[in-house]
């Protein structure tokens, strides 16, 4: 029986079905590499531009780690491709800005909702559509 040829997704350079359902993303490819070093049985799936993708297991759970570069444009392209490749839960880790003085530099922040003033998502959804995290994922974190 002949194996069906799978198309490589543009930008992230992996095929549909290559990505684990749980994905950690970050902007910096070096940070993605560092995170991947915490995984067991890790393998590099692809390195294409700012998208460096690794898969392995963490405490027996399959996890993929990928970078998406700087800015919302690269993140959106990466997230859409990750979903096509099999991602079901995407958690973005890394740095962010803040507006509350009591949240100091270096604080761990688990975001439940965000303002959508990025310049990209309004092209995909009305601004009235809320950017709210899945509460089951938030509770698990």
Where are these regions (language model features)?
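Metabolite-binding pocket within alpha/beta catalytic cores that recognizes anionic/polar moieties
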Residues: 2-140
């Amino acid at each position: 029986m002949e194996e069906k040829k799978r198309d490589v997704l543009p930008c992230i350079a992996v095929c549909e079905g290559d990505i684990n359902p749980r994905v950690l993303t970050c902007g910096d490819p070096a940070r993605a590499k560092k995170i991947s070093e915490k995984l067991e049985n890790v393998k590099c799936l692809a390195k294409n531009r700012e998208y460096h993708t690794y898969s392995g297991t963490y405490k027996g759970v399959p996890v993929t780690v990928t970078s998406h570069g700087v800015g919302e444009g690269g993140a959106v392209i990466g997230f859409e491709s990750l979903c096509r490749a099999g991602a079901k839960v995407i958690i973005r880790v890394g740095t962010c800005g803040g507006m509350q003085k009591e949240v100091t530099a270096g604080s761990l922040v688990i975001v439940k909702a965000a303002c959508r003033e990025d310049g990209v998502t309004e092209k995909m959804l009305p601004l009235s559509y809320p950017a709210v995290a899945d509460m089951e994922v938030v509770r698990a974190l």
